[in-house]
Amino acid sequence: IYISSGTWSLMGIERKTPDCSLKSCELNFTNEGGYEGRFRYIKNIMGLWMIQSVRHEVNDRYSFAEICAMAEEAKDFPSRVDANDECFLSPENMTEEVKDYCRRTGQQVPETMGEIATVIYTSLAECYAKAAKELEELTGRTYSRIHVVGGGSNAGYLNELTAKATGKEVHA
């Protein structure tokens, strides 16, 4: 399995034949033509757009590495969001949208940058785990590794969370 991790995340596999099944369509997997007649069988998942937005809201005061470190310090914060929820596509204020989502769903509301970041990173890792499980169900195969490429491959904490959530080795 690979994740092309950036503003958006593309998660999937490369295969020789497309999967045009109803189940594949229902789970939002797509087939993109690739090199030598292969297909990239992928799912588009919210990526680091949420973290990028939160960072911009504080005038880029922190580097992505600093945000990762703050998130790791707040790793026990319990709240989660559905990172693919439409409310996160283009909110007026991502920080407030994350807080509002937690409030609406009866969860603890994050207050610090670290808490907000850990909610986002953990929620993304859980989205990746769900997509990996769907991919395995659709293909009838089990995958032991996830290869992360792109700018998000530098988000060490997210990669650790992804390994934990999926039970797979993550190589970035």
Where are these regions (language model features)?
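Small/polar loops that bind or transfer phosphate-bearing groups
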Residues: G150
